[in-house]
Amino acid sequence: MKRLWAWVGLLALVLAALGQKAPGLEALLVRVLLKEVELGEEVRLALPTGEVALRGQAEGVVVEGRLLPSWAVEGPYFALEKRPYRGGLVARVEGGRLLLVNVLPLEDYLLGVLPAEMPASFPEEALKAQAVLARTFAVRRLNPLAPYDLCATEACQVYLGLSAETPRHERAVRATEGRVLSYAGQVASALYHADSGGMTAGSEEVFRKALPYLRPRPDPYAKGPKSVWQQAVRPEEAARALRALGYAPRGDDPPQVLEKSPSGRAWRVRLLGVEVRGPEAQRLLRLMGLPSAMAEFQGWLALGRGAGHGVGLSQWGAKVMAERGYGYREILGHYFPGTLLSPLEVAAR
């Protein structure tokens, strides 16, 4: 409990530095893990007032030679490894590593996410749909009891900071400000991928939980560079993928898709003497380097469609829908039937 209150107090310092109010926040804040650093390794931050060197050790954070329990830097900007970020930063030791966490308003965070997730060349309505999903994804991950809410990599949403921002992405964020997808009064699971291959996947096919608004559905709009593909797989790549899932290869037979999911993705796969089923079969194909699990095999040649896990919005599908005159609300309605576009304060109750 002491550690929790220490963290809350530290967050309050950052809020004050950013000119923000503590809960009930006028601008909702998110905490993004930028980097985990080994204890003893020095990190240098560029601040408006100059450079600061810090490193973690078991007792806390050493900043310019001073040992502190944790450390917060005020905004409005800072740079880590020559990449600038909006907002403030908190440094603390957790789990034997130094955590560097960017604390900033949700809408400012999205300005650094959208450019990483959808090109500025995509139509405005597609960018707006992506902005709503990125916001919804972030809000669903908020957890005040954890040391941070989100990471900055593909494991969460890619976050590139200030230098990635563009006027087109900013317009999409501002035009949808405070709007999230909701279902039955709760913030929805806002999943997205590159290309559905013509059929979206049910959420349980990949994430084991069936959600009523994430069902397999035809997607005639998904037309991207990976809508149809073929790729050779090397036996050693397949063996590595099996081992990564905890299986030991027991033969030399090439991959075979023995059963498909309702959306047409691999559901039971046999290769190298091993049979893998369910969501793990789809993960196996991705570990083998294939663009998607919507694939069949001719020996060691994979023939497939689409890119990504296939659940939720297809980004290339959103592009085509926008080009055909659909608005972002209609795009979201196609990929998330039954959901509502809600003000954040309503969906988060």
Q: What residue ranges belong to the model's regions?
A:
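Conserved, single-site charged/polar hotspot
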Residues: 1-349
